Amino acid sequence: MKSTFLWTACVTPFNCNGDSIDYSSLQRLLTMQVKAENGVVLLGSTGESLSLTDSEKRTLVEFVCKLKLNTEIIIGVPGVNLYQTLEWLDFCKGMPIHGYLMTTPIYAKPGIMGQTLWFEKLLEKAHVPVMFYNIPSRAGINLHAETVRNLSSHEKFWAIKDSSGTVDTLAQYKKVAPNIEVFCGDDNMISDMAAYGAAGLVSVASNVWPYVAHEYVKKCLNGRNPQADIWQQACEALFIASNPIPTKALLHDIGLIEHQTVRLPLSTEDLPSVEKLRQVNKMILGWKELATL
């Protein structure tokens, strides 16, 4: 896992009416990630995992594993019901995957010990390295620094994806658990978080721009910051509506997925316009410093 610094939080393409997964489009996206040498995260919030049935999630993981992709695969682990989550880990144990992304329990807002005991249960079941996911905007609470400290010596606890939106949280995690890698979870924060010791990026933008994202993150991690304003403008455009609505709209517009469909409660009608997305796509493709890609 040490060599992968960019992980793409993959969208889950659907057919036109949204009642099934479009596996042809999914395979096309995954092939691009392999060529760009990016790792893959399946069934996260960008992948609309909460909108998928258990059967759909299992079928998707089986499909991707059968492709035998030449890249590392991380599977999202929900933070809702403990027993269903443990069953999910039992299923994944039989799959040739490389890691888990475990979300801070959502809605319940557990304290330090609640989080610690929750993750202990999951770490005991995990057969591959685990990345915790700090996403307070969705979970309603931060992954506590004390929770990280409590679990930092566990052999399966490998990394944290931090989507707090501030470098202060990353600094806290690095202070209490210097052995745990911290990945930036917000595309527009990677240049700042790289300067504070981030190990890389878990990206939404790399769904659309896998090669550019790979090169940009590499430069940030090497202490360079090529025209960060261009990257930030592009990333902000991908969040003009709830993720992954804009990303799917742009992927469809440029012909990488057949349909921009999302599942309720998300709706494509909440996207103001695709024009802004077209503008930033043109800007990224004309990015002179990365034009060799």
From Swiss-Prot:
User: Keyword annotations for this protein?
Assistant: Amino-acid biosynthesis, Cytoplasm, Diaminopimelate biosynthesis, Lyase, Lysine biosynthesis, Schiff base
Q: What is its main location?
A: cytoplasm
Q: Which named protein is this?
A: 4-hydroxy-tetrahydrodipicolinate synthase
Natural source organism: Wolbachia pipientis wMel
* Family statement: Belongs to the DapA family.
Q: Pfam family example for this protein?
A: DHDPS
Q: Where in the cell is it found?
A: Cytoplasm
* Protein task: Catalyzes the condensation of (S)-aspartate-beta-semialdehyde [(S)-ASA] and pyruvate to 4-hydroxy-tetrahydrodipicolinate (HTPA).
Residues that, per the record, bind pyruvate: T46, V202
Its lineage reads:
Bacteria, Pseudomonadati, Pseudomonadota, Alphaproteobacteria, Rickettsiales
Q: Name one GO cellular component term.
A: cytosol
Active site annotation, chain numbering: Y133, K161
Give residue numbers for the site Part of a proton relay during catalysis: S45, Y107
Q: Name one GO molecular function term.
A: 4-hydroxy-tetrahydrodipicolinate synthase activity
Describe its assembly.
Homotetramer; dimer of dimers.
**Enzyme Commission number(s):** 4.3.3.7
GO BP annotation list: diaminopimelate biosynthetic process; lysine biosynthetic process via diaminopimelate
Catalytic activity of the protein: L-aspartate 4-semialdehyde + pyruvate = (2S,4S)-4-hydroxy-2,3,4,5-tetrahydrodipicolinate + H2O + H(+)
Record-linked InterPro entries: Aldolase_TIM, DapA, DapA-like, Schiff_base-form_aldolases_AS, Schiff_base-form_aldolases_CS
Q: In which pathway does it act?
A: Amino-acid biosynthesis; L-lysine biosynthesis via DAP pathway; (S)-tetrahydrodipicolinate from L-aspartate: step 3/4
SMART domains per record: DHDPS
